Regions:
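Internal alpha-helical scaffold of NAD(P)-dependent oxidoreductase catalytic cores
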Residues: 49, 151, 162, 186, ...
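General beta-strand structural signal in soluble alpha/beta enzymes
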Residues: 170, 195-200, 240-244, 303, ...
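Rossmann-like NAD(P)(H) cofactor-binding subdomain of soluble oxidoreductases
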Residues: 123, 129-138, 142-213, 229-231
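A short helix-to-beta-strand connector/capping loop
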Residues: 119-128, 192-194, 236-238, 363
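NAD(P)-dependent Rossmann-like dehydrogenase/reductase catalytic/cofactor-binding core
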Residues: 19, 25-47, 52-55, 256, ...
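NAD(P)+-binding Rossmann beta1-loop-alpha1 motif at the extreme N-terminus of oxidoreductases
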Residues: 28-46, 51-121, 131
Length: 430
């Protein structure tokens, strides 16, 4: 006869195994281990923990026994801004997430979830929410800005009256429409005296919320600011590396969106691994050429904010830019694709900006120009791709130096590309 105590133990064991299987099925085995270790580190003891679980539990216990006393504001309630604010709150920082809509703020505070961008993921109960911009940024140590690129300048102007020593960190990837300004350029223009940095890397918000191990790069000329951001966000799940190459890190985060669109289009045509590898490596070459022209260190593109972010964005169907590209590849118009996505896809604007800049500077960027032809000149994607493959002979590893090859011939070649491979009545457009 089984005793009540043994029965309870068996039930607990069964429940634990069910939790384990559910977590690993949803998030992956490694993330499941990390999640269980976190619970252990927060007071739920487990007998015979694995070495990984023990290490993570110790890390989380240290964080909660010695919380970082930084005062932080995160502006922008999208997926990435919310995920970063949640990390900071979990690390013990005094963290406020500012969202423009008052009704959304009330809903987030009540449910502790971001139902629009991160449905189903509970946020740390220490995270505070506000729609009052002045109150959100006053007396803070660091202000993280995670609004879309189109709203970045306006947001800086709105917080300018309340800046009195706070540092600014941009989480926004992309370029300002019509000016080609990076977010760091806008910060220097609007708030010339402020201490600032930019953060970028292979950071899909949903994976971060699932506690899947991830990493990012904080770039700033200020070593104290780099260290402060590392202290605020670094954990067993999320590593923060430092760099002083602001331009390179920022360009990596902006340019990779172009090639995520290209990869999404390629996926729609069900290409093989050879094609994907070709796109990825030639994209890296284009990024580095362009970066050198803009004053970046080409080696930065071999790090997390370059090839790391490029790989993650080009490999994931979670990427907004990948999804835009996939819809384009299936015959949908750019306007219809953007409408269906319902979120900002920075790569669409970036393609236009980089195409114009590269054409003027004579930087060899055939993939970028091909995408411009498809999106802005209504060229047939398949026809442009075929002409791209027929382009002249090139060297392979040439991306560590700026390229002086003119794009005039390539541009002229694409303008003459036929449109007979494009369907006039695509079902996806209806």
């Amino acid at each position: 006869m089984t005793s009540p105590n043994n029965s309870n133990k068996n039930n607990i064991s069964a429940n634990n195994e069910t939790d384990k299987e559910s977590s690993e099925k949803q998030n992956g085995m490694l993330a499941g281990i990390f999640e269980r270790a976190t619970k252990s580190g927060l007071g739920r003891k487990k007998s015979n923990p694995s070495p990984v679980e023990s290490a993570v539990a110790k890390d989380m216990a240290d964080i909660h026994s010695n919380p970082t006393k930084l005062r932080l504001a995160f502006l922008g309630g999208g997926s990435f801004g919310t995920a970063m604010a949640n990390l900071a709150a979990r690390n013990g920082c005094d963290t406020t997430l500012w969202v423009r809509n008052k009704r959304t703020v009330k809903a987030m505070a009540k449910t502790q979830t971001n139902k629009k961008y991160l449905p189903g993921y509970k946020l740390d109960d220490r995270l505070k929410y506000s729609h009052d911009l002045a109150a959100s940024v006053k007396d803070k140590d660091i202000i993280f800005i995670a609004v879309p690129g189109l709203a970045f300048r306006e947001t800086l102007k709105n917080i300018a009256p309340f800046i009195s020593g706070q540092s600014i960190v941009s989480l926004t990837k992309g370029m300002e429409k019509d000016t080609f300004a990076m977010m760091s350029d806008i910060i220097k223009e609007v708030l010339p005296e402020v201490n600032f940095g930019v953060m970028s890397g292979p950071n899909l918000a949903i994976e971060i919320m699932k506690n899947m191990p991830s990493a990012t790069v904080i770039a700033s000329e200020s070593e104290p600011l780099r260290h402060a951001v590392q202290a605020a966000l670094h954990s067993a799940f999320f590593r923060v590396f430092a760099s002083d190459d602001i331009r390179g890190v920022e360009l990596g985060g902006a340019l990779k969106n172009i090639y995520a669109i290209a990869m999404g289009m390629a996926a729609a045509y069900e290409v093989g691994e050879n094609t994907k590898a070709m796109i990825l490596t030639r994209a890296l070459a284009e990024m580095s050429r362009f970066g050198v022209e803009e004053g970046a260190n080409p080696l930065t593109f071999l790090g997390l904010s370059g090839v790391g972010d490029l790989y993650a964005t080009c490999s994931s169907e979670l990427s907004r830019n990948y999804r835009i590209g996939n819809m384009l590849g299936r015959g949908m118009s750019i306007d219809a694709a953007v409408k269906k996505l319902g979120q900002t896809a920075e790569g669409v604007n970036t393609i236009q900006q980089v195409h114009e800049k590269a054409t003027k500077a004579g930087i060899y960027m055939p993939i970028t120009h091909a995408l411009y032809a498809v999106i802005y000149e209504d060229k047939a994607a398949l026809g442009v791709a075929l002409h791209l493959m027929e382009a002249g002979f090139r060297s392979d590893v040439e991306f560590v130096m700026a390229h002086d090859h003119s794009n005039a011939a390539l541009t002229a070649h694409m303008k003459t590309s036929g449109s007979n491979t494009k369907s006039k009545d695509s079902d996806a457009d209806k």
